[in-house]
């Protein structure tokens, strides 16, 4: 009887040991599984964090031609670095500045420095340029009159009406002997500064984007490079004359990337600038626009 009890006790003890061993294995497996899941989750989280850290989006306001086209090329290059470029196109010269000033868009690309300075002064905005990208020669194009020396008394010439581009247009007319401006008028010139007008030329002022629409109604038009392109014209082959590529105008009126004050060191925007100043983009501009748009060094 005692031997039987001892045998049963031994079996019970063995069973308990075996059960404990299995319980230990089970607990270790569950803990290992939990740890693996935790590790996997942490790894997944780290990967997501890394992805979020490298993923950047830049929104830029631009006029369609050539700015939007140049940006579209830059977009392809930036995508290789994990940067998304969201291009918002505008057809006027006011809204692109307003949306950047309001913080709705990161930067813009459509204007030159004198226009920006004038806009800031008149609108009390704090926008700053961070890079000069290209220059668009202003040109005189034929309307009803096909050559400058064929202008008759009382001829009409359409020019942009914003202060900086109008001054630029008037300086180009003066450079070609059509009018003479008051000494020292320079980049602040207006039609009131015309002191000599032997052929009684009528200077007609229109919004920059509307000048080309009047080409069949006037004798000559003075067009910004981008609006000439929009009208199917090319400064290098269609213009009667253009601003010299080595002139002060080329430096003064280079088109710039603009941000709201305080965003000058934005990493993603500076990556955009780096691409726009690259040889790849410079060659794209030269090949695409044949002199109508000139990349800046």
Q: Which sequence ranges carry the predicted segments?
A:
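Short, low-complexity disordered leader/linker segments with a strong preference
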Residues: 1-57
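Periplasmic-binding protein-like
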Residues: 165-174, 276-296
């Amino acid at each position: 009887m005692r031997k039987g009890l001892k045998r049963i006790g031994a079996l019970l003890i063995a069973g308990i040991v075996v059960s404990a061993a299995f319980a230990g294995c089970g607990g270790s497996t569950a803990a290992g599984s939990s740890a693996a899941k935790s590790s996997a989750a942490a790894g997944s989280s780290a990967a997501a964090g890394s992805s979020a850290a490298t993923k950047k989006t830049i929104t830029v306001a631009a006029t369609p031609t050539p700015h939007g086209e140049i940006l579209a090329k830059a977009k392809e290059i930036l995508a290789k670095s994990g940067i998304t470029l969201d291009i918002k196109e505008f057809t006027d010269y006011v809204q692109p500045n307003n949306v950047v000033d309001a913080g709705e868009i990161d930067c813009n690309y459509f204007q030159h420095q004198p226009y920006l300075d004038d806009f800031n002064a008149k609108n009390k905005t704090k926008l700053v340029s961070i890079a000069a990208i290209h220059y668009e020669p202003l040109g005189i194009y034929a309307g009803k009159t096909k050559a400058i020396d064929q202008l008759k008394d009382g001829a009409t010439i359409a020019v942009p009406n914003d202060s900086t581009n109008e001054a630029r247009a008037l300086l180009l007319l003066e450079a070609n002997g059509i009018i003479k401006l008051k000494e020292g008028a320079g980049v602040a010139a207006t039609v009131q500064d015309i002191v000599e007008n032997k052929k009684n030329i009528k200077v007609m002022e229109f919004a920059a984007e509307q000048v080309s629409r009047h080409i069949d109604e006037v004798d000559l038009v003075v067009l910004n490079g981008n609006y000439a392109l929009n009208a199917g014209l090319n400064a290098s082959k269609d213009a009667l004359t253009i601003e010299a590529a080595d002139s002060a105008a080329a430096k003064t009126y280079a088109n710039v990337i603009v941000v709201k004050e305080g965003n000058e060191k934005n990493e993603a925007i500076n990556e955009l600038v780096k691409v726009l100043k690259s040889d790849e983009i410079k060659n794209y501009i030269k090949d695409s626009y044949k002199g109508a748009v000139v990349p800046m060094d």
